[in-house]
Amino acid sequence: MNPAYRKAMLESEIQKLLMEALQQLRDPRLKKDFVTFSRVELSKDKRYADVYVSFLGTPEERKETVEILNRAKGFFRTFIAKNLRLYVAPEIRFYEDKGIEASVKVHQLLVQLGYDPLKDKEKKEEDKEEE
């Protein structure tokens, strides 16, 4: 099996297991419905898993959510070890995913410059339908 393919499969499986573990985590401060693990990146030696977290809320709430998850990373690592057949379960590190926020800012800048990609796409589709 291609090593890159295996790594991608492991990352995907870890992401699914983390979502399951999140539902079992008992922390009243954590708003589970608004937390999403957007991506998981395994290190080459598979000892570390960097997990990027998306969260709807204020910047303070997002920072607090990442801190709560980092405090519970032992719980997540144990859950992965019990459910995934690996020699060593990777150490989990949670980070705030700023990709969505950055894409919204880029979109806002484009709109300010007079270019709205969404409207242009709709306009092109309408033009194709008229032809």
Swiss-Prot record:
Keyword terms, alphabetized: Cytoplasm, Ribosome biogenesis
Gene Ontology CC terms: cytosol
GO terms for MF: ribosomal small subunit binding
Compartment list: Cytoplasm
GO terms of biological process kind: maturation of SSU-rRNA; ribosome biogenesis
InterPro entries reported for this sequence: KH_dom-like_a/b, RbfA, RbfA_dom_sf, Ribosome-bd_factorA_CS
Quaternary organization: Monomer. Binds 30S ribosomal subunits, but not 50S ribosomal subunits or 70S ribosomes.
Family designation: Belongs to the RbfA family.
Stated role: One of several proteins that assist in the late maturation steps of the functional core of the 30S ribosomal subunit. Associates with free 30S ribosomal subunits (but not with 30S subunits that are part of 70S ribosomes or polysomes). Required for efficient processing of 16S rRNA. May interact with the 5'-terminal helix region of 16S rRNA.
Protein's recorded name: Ribosome-binding factor A
Organism: Thermotoga maritima (strain ATCC 43589 / DSM 3109 / JCM 10099 / NBRC 100826 / MSB8)
Classification of source organism: Bacteria, Thermotogati, Thermotogota, Thermotogae, Thermotogales
